[in-house]
Amino acid sequence: MTQQLEQIIDQAWENRADFSPKNAPADLRNAVAQVIAQLNEGTLRVAQKDSGAWVVNQWVKKAVLLSFRLEDNIAMPSGEYMQFYDKVPTKFANYTAEDFAKGGFRVVPPAVARHGSFIGKNVVMMPSFVNIGAYVDEGSMVDAWATVGSCAQIGKNVHLSGGVGIGGVLEPMQANPTIIEDNCFIGARSEIVEGVIVEENSVISMGVYIGQSTKIYDRATGEVTYGRIPAGSVVVSGNLPSADGKYSLYCAVIVKRVDAKTRAKTGINELLRD
């Protein structure tokens, strides 16, 4: 079944400009709906780790993007005083108390997750936003006003502090999702975007911005890399001088590395102190 869905989605993607809510064929509508439903249940993911490396299911991401071409905006009542007008229903629109109990997570008003996102057990959603295609694994905290972008992958026991932004793949369109691995801490108002991978047990300080063009400077080695924070890194914001010494440009600085045992025993503030 998955192979058949993939084939339908890939073929439709090549002609995506031709589709609209009025002319989309039934088999395409059904295929996209099945993919979104599986994303919603967590049985299908945009990306997963295989033998230590992240593998992106590009066809699943295409299905998410196609879904926007196949649906019209509709009015979505939400309580007595609020309404929305969108193509994607909210994840919890039809949830009962039993559904929430079975899910095993907390949703603090007015948190919003879109249909097609997955929320794992023991996740706490403070007033925040989780977009379609995103996967938030068990035990994680999405703190107040944090946003988890479309198709982003959040690992187990991750803390996304207040106002954190995890970039999506839809606007602007990106090749790969942003990934935060297990047991990471992302400090308040930090932004991780453009398919950057933060590997497990890392700590990102408050106000650190990392995209694919951001220089990541390792203080211990002097090496500059892009797009990936190594496992167990403690990262703060910094600057690197230009070659002519006339100006400096923003960078992210790896100030130290810690193993999982140290990470578990040491407080966040202590790790961030130099």
From Swiss-Prot:
A single GO molecular function term of this UniProt record: 2,3,4,5-tetrahydropyridine-2,6-dicarboxylate N-succinyltransferase activity
Protein's UniProt name: 2,3,4,5-tetrahydropyridine-2,6-dicarboxylate N-succinyltransferase
Entry keyword annotation includes Protein biosynthesis: no
GO cellular component: cytoplasm
Main localization, broad class: cytoplasm
Gene for this chain: dapD
Species, as recorded: Herminiimonas arsenicoxydans
EC numbers, comma separated: 2.3.1.117
Residues that hold substrate according to the record: R106, D143
Phylogenetic lineage: Bacteria, Pseudomonadati, Pseudomonadota, Betaproteobacteria, Burkholderiales
